Curated annotation (Swiss-Prot):
The gene is NST1. This is Stress response protein NST1. Keywords: Coiled coil, Cytoplasm, Phosphoprotein, Stress response. Residues 1-76, 446-593, 634-744, 953-980, 998-1029, 1214-1240 are annotated as: Disordered. With MSL1, acts as a negative regulator of salt tolerance.
Amino acid sequence: MPPNSKSKRRKNKSKQHNKKNGNSDPEQSINPTQLVPRMEPELYHTESDYPTSRVIKRAPNGDVIVEPINTDDDKKERTANLTHNKDSMDSASSLAFTLDSHWESLSPEEKKTILRIEKEEVFNVIRNYQDDHSCSCSVCGRRHLAMDQEMERIYNTLYAMDKDKDPETNPIKFHLGIIKELQISKNQQQNDLSSTKGEVVKNFLSSSTVGSLKEEVLHFKQKQLSKQEQAHNETADNTSLLEENLNNIHINKTSSEISANFNSVSDEELQQKYSNFTKTFISSHPKIAEEYVQKMMMYPNIRALTDDLMNSNGQGFLNAIEDFVRDGQIQASKKDDSITEDEASSTDLTDPKEFTTMLHSGKPLTEDEYADLQRNIAERMTNAYDTASKKFKDVSQLEKELFTRFMSGRDKKSFRELIIQSFKNKFDGELGPSVLAATLSSCFSSQSKDTSLDTDSIYEDEDEEDYDDYSEYAEDSEEVSEYEGIEAVEKPEHDEKSNGIRETLHLSYDHDHKRQNHPHHHYHSTSTHSEDELSEEEYISDIELPHDPHKHFHRDDDILDGDEDEPEEEDENEGDDEEDTYDSGLDETDRLEEGRKLIQIAITKLLQSRIMASYHEKQADNNRLKLLQELEEEKRKKREKEEKKQKKREKEKEKKRLQQLAKEEEKRKREEEKERLKKELEEREMRRREAQRKKVEEAKRKKDEERKRRLEEQQRREEMQEKQRKQKEELKRKREEEKKRIREQKRLEQEKLQKEKEEEERQRLIAEDALRKQKLNEEQTSANILSAKPFTENGVGNPVSSQSHPNMTNYQEDNSCSINDEILKMVNSVAASKPVSPTGFNVHDLLLPSTNNQMPAMEQSHLSQPGNQNNHFGTTTIPNALDLATKSSLQTENNYLMNSQTLENTSLLMHNNSSPTKLLPNDFGLSSWGGLTNTMSINPTCKPPVIQTSEMKSQAHKSSPQATMPSFGLPNGGTHRKSFTDELNTLTSMLSSSGFADTSLSSSGFPPSQRSVWNDQKSSFSGPSTAGNFNNSSIQSGMLLAPTLGSVESFPNRTSIWDSSTTPMMNKSELSGRNITSTAQDSPAFMASNIWSSNSQYNSPYLTSNVLQSPQISSGVDESHILDSIYNTYLAISPQDSLNPYIAIGTLFQNLVGLNLDYSTFINKLISMQGAYNCEFFTDNNGSITHVRFARQTPAGHSKGLLNQLFSGLNDPTATPFTSRPHTSTGASFPIASSTTQTS
């Protein structure tokens, strides 16, 4: 590094000035390296751990150097390691030696595997090359013969020729014989004097002389450098020019001296002189010295170099080596077609880019990476050069190789500039410019010489061993005879085995003697111009056959093509001439010879690849093993270091612990002394206080005894008071319990009396209701019989009834037997104390189940109308009074709201002063009757409404002065009165044998599950119901028949049921003006065509769509009223003997017809009642709700009992479904007490 401070610059200038003036002072002439001793780091604490990367010292030139710490043992070990490394580097100076060692380490089986070459493998090598390169030479077929076909023919011909010579020849033996021929041809061409100086240098020494020659060359180089350091004072540029001139002059002088010496000295004297020199400087072994002298006498260049070493201490030798490298570089840079093979080989050998590409796994380096590599190598070589010993230290073989290649490569100028700059930066202050130039030149020459000598000698050993292995394989393959004959011929020609298989692998130096230049320079063994095929084995085994894209070499000893100097363009234009030349100019012998050489090269290439593959595989295994060993060693060192640190920490802890114990012991002694003194003082004080304490305790004891006596007396008084208080509290508690028991008993007695009274009143009302209903039924029966007799006798029906009345089915409901049993008990209790009705009516029969009971066949009366679609007259349906006894008051109200719209004669619903002409729209149609043999309905559970009070009937007759229909649609004619007595007797007998419904009727007159007392099994009946209960109906389940009457209006009466004329009706606009909502006008209903038909089943749907709800009715029903109605209906129809029975969802929905809810709304209401009413559901597999259950608890707004709600609507004797409207409020329930008062 250049000095930065002023003092250093002054010091350097003074040193240079002293050198220029030639100061004779012995102190000043001493080398600075002798004045500054070598500095070594000192360790003050040998047991301490010093970081190896933190020890810093100063170099002799002032630089700061960081080095690891070396103890005495480490120094000895390092010295031994350096000695061992030096010996190993001398014995294995290149990768070729490693490859040779690898071949020796292979087992015989592995060697056989490598040497076993098949025919297809040889042709694959040739084909792979042919795919990448196209050629038009004679060997390749002059563009019209396939290379593989020609080579296969040549191969078969050569194999047949060898087979004729030796019948035991096989492909493997044939391949080895071809390689042996290549070795023999190599030995024959070694005496060629046209080889270059570079090849002479590489071949003139054996492997045993390499180490000694390297040391001698370095010794001569150091002496020369010391002389040049004292002699040259010029600048670096002038020195370099002068050296070039001197080198040229020296070479001329050397040649002249050599010629003079040869003339003046005899051969014997020269041989003796050379022998002495060789024994002294090269090797003391006589055989080696003799071999060297023999080779030296054969090659004049070697003699010239030896004379230079003897006379001028090797200066001429170094200059010769440098000139050789320089000449090779100049020749490699020329792109002349006549370039020799040796020059191209030298170029390839010294091409640093190719070498770095091979080291980089076949990937070429970028320009930046290549420049960084050159700079690092320059700095490394500069730092490794020691000015004291004049040697390079700690330089690896790879660094030496890279340095040599960079110095002799195409970009050597730039690299040398880097070297010069690096040397100037480090040694400018110590060495002069001329010394720097000489040092660089000698270093480069030394490195080049070492590399060339190492490579040549190692290849000699390697090839010798390879030859032995081939011979061993031949013996194992029973092919010894041929190879023994070949060896017998070869041994007289060459004494050593250095010309074995290495001659096959070392092909780069045979090209000068075995080949002549072909116009296309075509050679088929390697393709060094291809970046993909350039690999490490080409460098190691020195098989670097030059190949430009249009240069191919062929060996032809006797024939030279006449087109050697012609350019490639002329060859392309003269393709036809070349084909003629191929056909006529070359004979079969030449083609066979060329083919044999191609096969030789292909086999050589295949052997190279196999050996390198085996080497890389073994190297990979060794690397893995080495890595594992290094990891294990690293772990061991780390573990030892940790153990050492742990021991040190434990030692420190023990030392600290002992110190702490000593401190604690001293402290304890001081504390004990203090405690002793303190105790003495305390004892004196305690004795004084003890006397005083005794006096005080005596006085205190007396006071305590007095206080204790007073406390005992106080405690006894408090215990007596507490005992008296507890006695008083016990007496008071007993009195309170007695009073509470008496009050509870009175309350229970009152409740019992109240329940008895309510039960008696309820039974009385039930009995009265039953009697009243029986009476009404009898009267209605008689009236219906009289009105139906003319129809039966005449057999005439209404021809248009099917167009004006819808098909209706009766309700179905499953009633609990518990309610019937309860009602039966109440009726029996009342009936037991009252006389039986004079009509022979049996109340017990009314409460029997209606499953198998037969009732008289009497259908509901109809109003016969002509076929006018605007007719609004309908049938009158009267509810059965018995149904009121089993339904709750709220159920009665809801059903009334629904069924009140089906009444035709609204005079039954109005006040007595109302007009008798008020009629209902014809929304519901009832089936006709045909006689006593007709069935009541297809559904056996259908029951007809047949109840009408005599008061209502009389009102209907009094209010109309003209001839009108009776309230049940029967005529007033007296022609049928004559048979009334007979009909009445028949009905009475039937009633006596039949029971009324076991279930209750709804307030609208349509009993859900009661059999008719007038029908037989074939009569048909229809009434308002859900769509799911219509017979043969397509109406979906859950559809409701909504009420259609908002207010009752009057309609004109008919004069006769047989009248075909139609009385003009009010139009829709008049109805809408009067707030009448009728769906019959928009949704026509259908009836059977014949009301007298005995088989009257309906085939048409009753309604085609859902009927809209009347806004007048829906406005009076709020949300809470709907929820209460659902809950009360559930309590009314659920059995009383079970706590929480499940009720079918359809049954509960059918009993809520009066609420005008569709099925989806009904389900939503039930879901909303889960929280407030404790509602629970039961679903099927599809998730649909099928049953519902309510907990029997009183919900919000339901404070009355079940029986109170069941009979709240019957408390008023005058309030019937035909005389009053039901309540629509939801906030209050129906009181029983007030009803009882009114009844009484």
